[in-house]
Each structure stands twice: as structure tokens, then as C-alpha cells.
């Protein structure tokens, strides 16, 4: 699936802590339309955190659908993600939505794609999506492997590095965090 322009979302787990952070830039073509968008949210009574890369309106639609699945499945993250992915793949209206979601609860971190994929990251719950994702993933991997920094600091540093390199990512960061 294409990496969407206009954002960087990073999620890291360390110890009993999980953090998702994102930048605030919204771009339309080669123009910055907004610099303080909030692309990271708390869902399901604050027990799930999520971030999106892709079209803003599409992402809000997906957040609503995902939260409905969380309610339907009593907050079971994996089950809700699989059901959303199924709907996203089969529903004609949803199929046109262009976004990726990074979601996490106290136990799991997942990427949900419009292709119907639900992907659990291989290492340290590290997720990096969006145009600056590869830069942020590289930075976060190095920090996880070589420092004892807390998850929030790793996410912040990875977003900063991505923002220094990716023209579609800025330095206006928002974070959501869950402690185990």
C-alpha cells in the first residue's frame, strides 16, 4: 500500500508503557494547509490510543468505525481491528478511504490498512507510518537498541528526526500514552 503524504505517526512500547505520537502538518499538494492538526486520539473510554496517516476526513470516518467495533467487542483490540479491516475491504464506501491506522492498547500494537491487513509489529511495538515513517522507524530502532530512554522520549526524538528530513512532516507533535 502507498505511504500517504502529509504526516508521520510513531508508536513505541517500552516496559509497561506505550506511546503514539504524530506531527501536525496537513498538506494539500505542495502547500501546507494546517500545522497543528491532531492526528492522535484516545478511543474506547481512554483505553485505546490511535493515530492516522492519510486523508483527514477518511481517518475520522475510520476512527468512528473502529470505535464502534471496539464497543461491539468490549474493547478487544485485535478482534475490533480484524472486523474493521474486513469492513474496510468489503464495504464499497469504505474501500475508497485512503488512510492507515496505528492503534494500541495495554497489550497490543497494530497497523490497520485499507487492504484488509492487520499487522502486528515485529519488535518493541514499533510502528511508523506516513511519509516520514521510514525515517522515524530508523531513528526509533536505533534509540530502542542503544539507549534506555522512555517510550515517549523515543517517539518525540523519532518524530523530530522525521520532521527534519520529510517535507510533509512538521515539529508540532501530539502524544497519547498508556501505562500498564
UniProtKB/Swiss-Prot annotation:
Keyword Metal-binding: yes
Superkingdom of origin: Bacteria
GO cellular component terms given for this protein: HslUV protease complex; proteasome core complex
PROSITE patterns with a match to the protein in the record: PROTEASOME_BETA_2 (PS51476)
EC number from the UniProt entry: 3.4.25.2
Database matches in Gene3D superfamilies: Glutamine Phosphoribosylpyrophosphate, subunit 1, domain 1
Localization of this protein: Cytoplasm
InterPro entries named in the record: ATP-dep_Prtase_HsIV_su, Ntn_hydrolases_N, Proteasome_sua/b, Proteasome_suB-type
Active site, per annotation: 7
Reported regulation of activity: Allosterically activated by HslU binding.
Major location (coarse): cytoplasm
Pfam families: Proteasome
Keyword check for Acetylation: no
PANTHER family on file: ATP-DEPENDENT PROTEASE SUBUNIT HSLV, METALLOPROTEASE TLDD
Function statement: Protease subunit of a proteasome-like degradation complex believed to be a general protein degrading machinery.
Assembly and binders: A double ring-shaped homohexamer of HslV is capped on each side by a ring-shaped HslU homohexamer. The assembly of the HslU/HslV complex is dependent on binding of ATP.
Protein name as annotated: ATP-dependent protease subunit HslV
Gene designation per UniProt: hslV
